[in-house]
Each structure stands twice: as C-alpha cells, then as structure tokens.
C-alpha cells in the first residue's frame, strides 16, 4: 500500500467496487468529476448505480481491467494475488486503501466523523437526514444506504462532509476531523489492535485530533474512559456528552418502545420530545447523539430534533424484506453481541405475541473465537429460537475448531438452537419451526442477507 497519499490521483480504478463502502467512495469521486473504473466478483445493484453515473465496471478480476488508470483503490478484503493489484505494483502505480482515497476527498472540507463499535451507520444517517432537513447540503459517505435518499454517499455543495469513520483498522486516524461523534468504545477488532488498551488509545487519539468539538456517549464504559482521558490530556477541548446518565449534557429519558420509539431530551434546562420512525431503545440514544452534534454545530434544538425524527432507516439495519403467512422476515447488520442484543430488543417491541427466530451468521474467525460465549448468551437471552450458520471469514483464513458450532454448542438450552451450515437446509428448518406471528431476523455483516430469498421461498412452500 502507498504510504503517502499523492496530491493528484488522476483516473481511479477500484478493485472490489461493489461493496457498500467502496461503491459509496467511488460514487463520490464520480460526482466530483473524476474518471472511475472498477471491478468486482459479482454483479449487484451498486454496480448498476455506478455504471449509471458513467463508471466502467467489469465483473471478474483481470489485469486488463486496470486499463490506463493512474491510481488503484483497494479494500481490506483484497487478496495479494489479485491480478489487478499485481499489475499496479509492476507499473509502480499508487495503491491506496479505500480509507486513504476517502481521506484525499474529505480532508478538503469541514469534516464531521462518526466513530464507534456500534451505531455508526444509523447515527451518520440521522445526522445527514437532520442536516438536509435543516437546509444544509452536506457531502456524505455512510456504511449503508440511507433509505430516504437511496444512496450511501453524495457530493453536496455545502462546507460539511459527514463520514462514517472506520475504526476497525485505525484508518479513522487518517482524517482531519473538525467534529467527532463517538457512539461507544465497546471492545472489538482486537485482532487488529491486540489489546483493549490499544483500542481505547486509538479513540483517544481520534478525539484529541478533532479540532472543534467531540460528542461522546455518557453511558458506555469505554466511552466514559475516553472522555476522562481526553479531558485530562486536552482540558480546553470542547466536549458534549449524551445518554441516559444523569450528568449527560444531553440527557435522554422517558423512552417508550411500545410501538414507535418516543423519548424526551433535556438540553440547557429545556426539554424536547420526539417520536422516531425507526424502532428500538438504542435508536433513541443514537438520535440523542445526532441531536448533540447538530446543536453543537449551532443549529436550533427543536428544529434539529424534528429533522432527525424524519430519519427512515438504512438498508441492512432492521430492514423488512417480506411477510409470508404471517411470518415477517427482517435483515440486520448486527455482528457484535451488543448489536445483536439491540436488534433483538427492537424486534421484541414489534413482534407482539409472536416468537423471535434469529438466523445468525458469525463474522470473522477471530471475533467468533473471542466472543462465542457472549454471542450464545445474547442470542439465547433475546431470541426464542436460533439458527446458527457457519462463519463468514471475510479477510481471515479459517481457524481450526472455529465454526458456527462453537456458538451453538455454548447454549444452555440446546433444544433452542441449531447449527446448520447448508443454507437451503437452514432456510427449510426455519420455515418448518416458524408459525403465524413469528419474527425471523437474519443477523450478520457478511453475506447472510443472501439467504433472505431462500427463507421467503421456504416459507411459501411450507406455510402457504
């Protein structure tokens, strides 16, 4: 990878351009007037969207796809034997990680960066929705498609650039951040950082480098520790806290989750209330973080909260895909025990008298090994039935003994869980145990969403 980002990038070629993050960045370059080409192993809606904007996208990887590109952009999931990557090295082309390419764009604007182990995509979507509702025209890049906008990124005319900042490999430290939002510092990505202390250190550095304002959770223990360290290291830094804690600058209370989420916020002795369009107690907290950031930027509080409340969700975040014979099928990106608990808690608020059936795809061998017990305890506590698929390894090589069975075998009540590696068999099993009124939800940030059509087909075959 190129260590120094060039001043000019010229024509860009994106390897693995079909993913949500890469396609969003490619779109920004296209809308900023750059020539973009790319490749991916499979055709997708993201590929079609980029082609519609003028990008030449090839399906499959081949050295010829690089063409006359001046810069190669790659993702962390790239294998080093990729022919396009090898050709770029032979030609001496700059090879940028996607975070470096994004930094080249965003460091030219006033940057709002959203970081944290969970809640980044939703919080970013709320901030963008709020800014648009307040009349601003920000540029943005999000980890998921904002449903009301039909895109995960856009080049706007305003001074602000809102970005979901990736902490997984430390790349969020590349950005010249003006305003930072830290949703939480729950332990994750320890395969990269090596220890919880190093993970926390990265967030402290991220906060210290934020020039204007840091907005941080008052409820999360890791975030509290970052706040304490930040105030000691940079006593003049402007910090706003949000959450349910009594000492939070923006305090959330009176949360009602029976139906649409309603809650109240206290801010500078004033009280504001809102009702969201997305379910789940955690989204009241996410909205409070977005509110703290917008009011910290100087926007009027009541108007800010009203604009945030118009947020209608993002793809792959508690997304309904269909209902068959009274059985609803949802998909969610949750891939950490805390996220799984939040998604299933939200499901409980809408399922009524029905049961929750979780179809869980563990993500990464390292995460599965580290958190198998926590995944099992969370799934068993919040779901009535669970189907565990095999591990989606992404960038990692398989580890001996680390499969989905590692999670399933830790259930205290084995009759409530089934480890099924074959997707069709898993879909059929789910359809057979489901009954009218049940809530089926797929969980994971790999490719588990691809099982949803099989689930719906199996339900039609078994239930109708």
Curated annotation (Swiss-Prot):
InterPro entries referenced in this protein's UniProt entry, alphabetically: Mur-like_cat_sf, Mur_ligase_C, Mur_ligase_C_dom_sf, Mur_ligase_cen, Mur_ligase_N, MurCDEF_pg_biosynth, UDP-N-AcMur_Ala_ligase_MurC
Task: Show the stretches that span the lipid bilayer.
Answer: none
Asked whether the keyword Zinc is assigned, the reply is no
**Which residues participate in ATP binding?**
116-122
Record has Cytoplasm as a keyword: yes
Please give one Gene Ontology molecular function term for this protein: UDP-N-acetylmuramate-L-alanine ligase activity
Q: Which UniProt keywords apply?
A: ATP-binding, Cell cycle, Cell division, Cell shape, Cell wall biogenesis/degradation, Cytoplasm, Ligase, Nucleotide-binding, Peptidoglycan synthesis
EC number, UniProt record = 6.3.2.8
Q: Which processes are annotated in GO (biological process)? A: cell division; cell wall organization; peptidoglycan biosynthetic process; regulation of cell shape
Q: Where in the cell is it found?
A: Cytoplasm
Which EC class heads this enzyme's classification?
A: ligase
| Pathway named in the protein's UniProt entry | Cell wall biogenesis; peptidoglycan biosynthesis
* Gene3D superfamilies given in the database record: Mur ligase, C-terminal domain, Mur-like, catalytic domain, NAD(P)-binding Rossmann-like Domain
Pfam families, alphabetized: Mur_ligase (PF01225), Mur_ligase_C (PF02875), Mur_ligase_M (PF08245)
Role: Cell wall formation.
Similarity annotation? Belongs to the MurCDEF family.
Q: Which HAMAP family match?
A: MurC (MF_00046)
Official protein name in the record: UDP-N-acetylmuramate--L-alanine ligase
Q: Which gene encodes it?
A: murC
């Amino acid at each position: 990878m190129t260590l120094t980002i060039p001043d000019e990038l010229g024509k860009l070629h994106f390897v693995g351009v079909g993913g949500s993050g890469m396609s969003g960045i490619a779109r920004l370059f296209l809308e900023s007037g750059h020539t973009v080409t790319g490749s991916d192993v499979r055709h997708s809606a993201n590929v079609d969207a980029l082609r519609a904007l003028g990008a030449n996208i090839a399906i499959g990887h081949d050295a010829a796809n690089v063409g006359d590109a001046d810069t190669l952009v790659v993702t962390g999931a790239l294998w080093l034997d990729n022919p396009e990557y090898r050709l770029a090295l032979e030609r001496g082309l700059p090879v940028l990680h996607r975070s470096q390419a994004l930094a080249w764009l965003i460091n030219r604007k006033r940057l709002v960066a959203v970081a944290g182990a969970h809640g980044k995509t939703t919080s970013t979507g709320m901030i963008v929705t709020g800014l648009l509702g307040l009349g601003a025209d920000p540029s943005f890049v999000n980890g998921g498609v904002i449903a009301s906008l039909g895109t995960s990124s856009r080049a706007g005319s305003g001074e602000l650039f809102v970005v979901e900042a990736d902490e997984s490999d430390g790349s969020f430290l590349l950005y010249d951040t003006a305003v930072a939002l830290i949703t939480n510092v729950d332990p994750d990505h320890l395969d990269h950082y090596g220890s919880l202390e190093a993970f926390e250190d990265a967030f402290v550095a991220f906060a210290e480098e934020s020039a204007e304002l840091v907005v941080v959770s008052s409820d999360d223990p890791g975030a509290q520790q970052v706040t304490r360290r930040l105030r000691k290291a940079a006593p003049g830094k402007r910090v706003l806290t949000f959450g349910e804690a009594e000492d939070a600058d923006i305090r959330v209370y009176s949360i009602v989750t029976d139906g649409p989420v309603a809650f109240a916020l206290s801010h500078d002795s004033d009280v504001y209330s809102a009702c969201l369009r997305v379910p789940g107690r955690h989204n009241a907290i996410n909205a409070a973080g977005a509110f703290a950031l917008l009011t910290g930027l100087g926007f009027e509080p009541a108007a800010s909260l009203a604009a945030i409340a118009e947020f209608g969700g993002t793809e792959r975040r508690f997304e309904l895909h269909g209902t068959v014979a009274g059985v609803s099928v949802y998909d969610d990106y949750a891939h950490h025990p805390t996220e799984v608990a939040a998604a299933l808690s939200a499901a409980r608020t809408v399922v009524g008298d029905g049961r929750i059936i979780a179809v869980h795809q563990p993500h990464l061998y390292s995460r599965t090994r580290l958190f198998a017990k926590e995944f099992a305890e969370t799934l068993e506590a919040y779901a009535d039935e669970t189907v565990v698929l095999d591990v989606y390894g992404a960038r990692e090589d398989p580890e001996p003994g680390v499969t989905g069975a590692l999670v399933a075998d830790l259930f205290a009540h084995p009759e409530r869980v089934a480890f099924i590696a074959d997707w069709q068999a898993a879909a059929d099993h789910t359809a057979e145990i489901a009954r009218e009124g049940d809530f089926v939800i797929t969980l994971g940030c790999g490719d588990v969403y691809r099982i949803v059509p099989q689930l719906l087909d199996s339900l039609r075959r078994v239930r109708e």
